[in-house]
């Protein structure tokens, strides 16, 4: 299979040919900060004190509304967030904030103001695909990636985050993780139902971001490791590794390690950090060639 992947659109580019910033190639540790408080900033500083410069800080809960609600209305950012980014960068580390690339909350002001329903992915009966996550218990709609309105919104967010917050790029959640949905909307410019439009639409979006909006030496990355998205993103965050009733084998890195950068290995519950399992999982992460971490620094 590895040999076959070199003949595919997603597998025929080496890391060296993809213009990935050197700082990301050199990165060996990521932390996941949640919130913009003195406690969080103190934990980040303590982590940098211990591990040294060059840490990647993946920032969550920086936006105006609670997590997994009111997407894509992230602005205004919390007042202290720009200063937090600056502090991280002055310590010769890098900060990349979270946005979601797939969900639109129907309770968001923008959903009404911009007619978000027109961008929503539609089932055959015309109803919406909806999802509720335990982090918020709020209903979100799945947006069709072929929607030109959605492209405009995501690109606008990428521009605003870089221009106003001066980050080292943007993380766009779920794109490389969530399965495509058949869409029967008549206004999105694709054939009704399933097809490769899902991937091609996200490719067009990310290609536009990379070609016209991503600042020099900034990165864009996404969740999980669906192989068709490998060349679109500078890095893939692999954190949904299953554990129950299975044995983990490093199939993905065996096939793709020379063409993709991955970060992390699994979610790390708070209770596990002081246990042997945490060390074992980090050992697996290291052996499988993934950049270490994605652990809350306050732990």
Show where each model-derived region lies.
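Flexible loop/turn segments at secondary-structure boundaries
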Residues: 38-39, 64-68, 102-107, 177-181, ...
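Aromatic- and acidic-residue-enriched carbohydrate-binding clefts of CAZyme catalytic domains
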Residues: 56-79, 110-147, 178-203
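A cross-domain feature marking catalytic cores of carbohydrate-active enzymes
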Residues: 33-35, 59-61, 97-101, 174, ...
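Active-site and adjacent substrate-binding regions of carbohydrate-active enzymes
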Residues: 43, 47, 88, 149-211, ...
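Active-site-adjacent "subsite" loops/lids of carbohydrate-active enzymes
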Residues: 79-165, 242-259, 263-264
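Active-site-proximal substrate-binding groove within the catalytic cores of carbohydrate-active enzymes
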Residues: 198-299
């Amino acid at each position: 299979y590895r040999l076959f992947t070199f003949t595919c659109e997603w597998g025929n580019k080496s890391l060296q040919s993809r213009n990935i910033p050197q700082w990301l190639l050199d990165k060996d540790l990521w932390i996941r900060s949640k919130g913009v408080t003195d406690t969080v900033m103190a934990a980040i500083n303590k982590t940098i004190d211990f591990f040294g410069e060059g840490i990647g800080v993946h920032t969550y809960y920086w936006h105006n509304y609670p997590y997994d609600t009111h997407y894509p209305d992230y602005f205004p950012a919390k007042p202290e967030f720009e200063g937090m980014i600056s502090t991280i960068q002055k310590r010769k580390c890098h900060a990349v904030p979270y946005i979601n690339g797939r969900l639109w909350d129907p309770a968001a002001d923008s959903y009404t103001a911009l007619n978000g329903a027109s961008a929503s992915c539609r089932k055959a009966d015309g109803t919406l695909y909806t999802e509720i996550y335990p982090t918020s218990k709020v209903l979100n709609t799945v947006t069709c990636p072929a929607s030109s309105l959605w492209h405009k919104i995501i690109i606008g967010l990428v521009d605003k985050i870089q221009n106003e917050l001066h980050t080292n790029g943007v993380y766009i959640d779920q794109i490389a993780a969530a399965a495509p949905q058949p869409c029967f909307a008549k206004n999105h410019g694709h054939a009704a139902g399933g097809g490769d439009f899902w991937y091609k639409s996200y490719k067009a979006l990310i290609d536009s971001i990379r070609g016209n909006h991503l600042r020099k030496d900034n990165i864009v990355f996404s969740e999980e490791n669906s192989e068709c998205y490998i060349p679109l993103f500078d890095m893939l965050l692999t954190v949904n590794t299953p554990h129950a009733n299975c044995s983990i084998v490093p199939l993905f890195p065996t096939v793709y390690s020379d063409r993709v950068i991955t970060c992390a290995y699994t979610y790390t519950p708070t209770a596990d950090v002081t246990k042997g399992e945490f060390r074992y999982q980090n050992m697996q992460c290291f052996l499988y060639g993934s950049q270490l971490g994605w652990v809350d620094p306050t732990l």
